[in-house]
Amino acid sequence: IILINDIGFDNFTFKKLGTKIGSNESSIYRYFESKHKLLLYLSSWYWAWLEYQLVIETFSISNHLEKLEKAVTIVTRTVVEDNNFAHIDETLLYKIIVNESSKSFLTKEVDKENEEGYFEVYKRVITRISEMILNVKKEYSFSLSLASTIIE
């Protein structure tokens, strides 16, 4: 995460990562088939972390409008380091998501990756917020679009 943040995803290679962490390049390929798959993993981790916050922080709110307002606050607030996950710097990960995540779905393989579930957590976050919107205003026809716009 630190290296991708420092040099950008386009300049990032497993060879550079291996040098940085004192490992050989081939050992990294055991975990990730390509740097694109690493970006997909980091993206999924970020959206799962955000979903975790949504669930934990809105679970006990019974008023639908208050729940939606809290959800919007959660997905739009400034990201700070989460001590529950000391192995990840969420502030740097957020910067990577903002700057590089479009590269995870602007590929020829996007449909196949979608079928394989790579974007499932992201879609779940959108669905959660969409459902909160519909709980406030059931007749609103574009809740998925609005939810997507809010998190982007």
Question: Can you say where each PLM-predicted feature lies in the sequence?
Answer:
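Alpha-helical structural segments
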Residues: I2, L38-F59, K70-I74
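Amphipathic alpha-helical segments within well-ordered protein domains
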Residues: Y29, E51-V55, S130, L134
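Amphipathic alpha-helical packing segments from all-alpha helical-bundle domains
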Residues: L93-V136
